[in-house]
Amino acid sequence: MISDSMTVEEIRLHLGLALKEKDFVVDKTGVKTIEIIGASFVADEPFIFGALNDEYIQRELEWYKSKSLFVKDIPGETPKIWQQVASSKGEINSNYGWAIWSEDNYAQYDMCLAELGQNPDSRRGIMIYTRPSMQFDYNKDGMSDFMCTNTVQYLIRDKKINAVVNMRSNDVVFGFRNDYAWQKYVLDKLVSDLNAGDPTRQYKAGSIIWNVGSLHVYSRHFYLVDHWWKTGETHIVKKDYKGEWK
């Protein structure tokens, strides 16, 4: 059975209440946030607030597939956030394709695929993204990139492959929607690859469970939370928003 976790809609409610009560947490840069500590929910929608950016999601996926640790290799214009966190050489840690496919990180995808192929009931089907040296690697050569995803565990139950995502930190607006798209891609690929190895398996993608140490919304996106609280709509263009958090 899947734990009786919260849904995305319930996460919206908790964040809406935090904003209404002005329960702010100030981050290291002095920016106000609202935050859920120890968030755990079923990722049953592809975004929480805002709207999907399919064009960027596809560009990021292509970069992940390349396994490049350099932001210049992101197709199209390099997003400002990646430029800001990169080292003086334009290098980062958080190419998630590198994290699961590179031999330099012990081929996490292949290890997980082999484990689940040999033992479908295993609790060892896990892809480890981060590493102990991240404590030092995150600020190498002027970098500011402490990988947000720790591990993703895959559990096969009742012919469904469920993903349990474990993160130290996740931005609700930009972070979640892009990370969800990536995790959905990897889950679907894992299902396909396991079925290709033995057509009698007939596995299907199950639930994605999202566990986050700090799930947060930055003040620049408070207007989205407020708009949802008042209307039930998850997105509005900022210039059209008329509330307190303009």
UniProtKB/Swiss-Prot annotation:
It holds the Pfam family Thymidylat_synt. It catalyses: dCMP + (6R)-5,10-methylene-5,6,7,8-tetrahydrofolate + H2O = 5-hydroxymethyl-dCMP + (6S)-5,6,7,8-tetrahydrofolate. The keyword Transferase applies. Keywords: Transferase. The active site is at 148. GO terms for molecular function: deoxycytidylate 5-hydroxymethyltransferase activity. Its EC number is 2.1.2.8. Belongs to the thymidylate synthase family. This is Deoxycytidylate 5-hydroxymethyltransferase. The gene is 42.
